[in-house]
Amino acid sequence: MITPKFELRQDEEFVYLDVHTPYIKAKNVEIDAFNNEVNFCIAPYFLKLELPGNVLDDDRANASYDISSGFVHIKFPKETPGEVFPDLDLLTTLLVNQNKEPVKKPLIEEVEDTPSPSTSQNASKDEEKEVKIDWQNIHFDDPDFDWGLLQRLDDEKMQYTSTSQYGFNNQYSGLLKYNALVGNEINQIPEPERTPPSTRSEIRVQLEDEKFDAEHYMADFYDREMIDEILHYIPDYIGEFLLVQQGKSDRLLEFTSEEKEALAKLPKRSYLIDNPKNVYLCLVPLIFAYAYDNRTTLGDPTIESCWNIGTLSSTISCLDTNFLAIKDIFIACIRRSLAYPLYRNWDLALTCWKDTHAILSLGKRWILRVLLRIRNLFEHHDVYYIYNAIVLNDYAYWIQTANDNVLAALAYQVSECTITKEETNWPLEEIEANVQETIIASDEESESIEK
């Protein structure tokens, strides 16, 4: 069966579902709803949704078919008028997983002493108490923060999945066994199926050191014309970010029809996130890599965009998820942007880091839009499409369920993080000083000739 394109919206009393099913016989459509589940079926289409609130299938519910547009327009009354159903635009999260498995218990559980009768009477009340987290002071570099608590709070719908070697949540293996050997110019790990995470980090740093070219960096430091044009470019997310800062935007983002179609087609996954902190942190290199490519192409992706994004993102090129702090990621992003792409400039790298902060601060919908853009680029490449299966499909689904407070904390700490040129372990200041001396000497020579 085919999952059709669909959209959802709401008002105070009703939920509206529009399903695109052209060339059908409307009389054969089967529609029903019970509590928060909605079913739509007409060969060859099937749609099963799980709404964030309950609806009623009573006399007020109705459906009509627009032959010209091919849409079935369905209306269900809300069980509780005035209730706001959140995230109706995050379509992937509404699709019911047809292959659900029972949630498996963790291998290790916390157990308590046998409760007394008085304890048992108060157990249900204690369980209902909301766990309080000081979101303002959460810090990604704090070794004492209980990331397992965040997992228990946010991932009630997620189920157990075995993990292995690389990719999102370190849960994939075997996918790069042959792909890495056939025209994959992004992959930088010689044996991705056999290389442990710590070794991947070491290989990444070593390759960056070997790739850094002082003359290339010197040339981009001296010749600023194209660099300045790139720095003055304003991407769409920066425009939106500036409006938000000025209080002129409410952050509401409406997905395009292409984005909605991509969301509906995303494979719905179930996860047990072993290391939530790591999943949030490894999102940053992806966003940075996109920000660099988007800025240097002035918003018009090229045939090199896949390579740019994949190579700049250590999450993809080196399968490196072995980061413990935001500063480690900052240094890795800056180093890669100064070692691999066409434009290698310190100011450009820092600007792309600021772009990363802007995207993260706009929230999960803008992050999702960026991930869908990256995913679309990789989807149409003969070799690099594999990274959708390893990284991008999962991130595009997971971000729809990510914790807004943690994303805000991540964005804040990205903005607060600073590094020096010395922390790249490359002689950037020395190179720049040599360029300045050369310029001064050249100017003095020109003046003496004129005299």
From Swiss-Prot:
Domain of life: Eukaryota
One of the record's GO cellular component terms: nucleoplasm
Keywords: Nucleus
GO biological process, one term: rRNA processing
Coiled-coil residue spans: none
Keyword S-adenosyl-L-methionine on entry: no
Record InterPro entries: CS_dom, HSP20-like_chaperone, Shq1, SHQ1-like_CS, Shq1_C
Record region (Disordered): 106-128
Molecular function in Gene Ontology: unfolded protein binding
Subcellular location: Nucleus
PROSITE patterns referenced in this protein's UniProt entry, alphabetically: CS
Occurrences of domain CS (ranges): 1-89
Function text: Involved in the early biogenesis steps of box H/ACA snoRNP assembly.
Family named by the database record: Belongs to the SHQ1 family.
Name of protein: Protein shq1
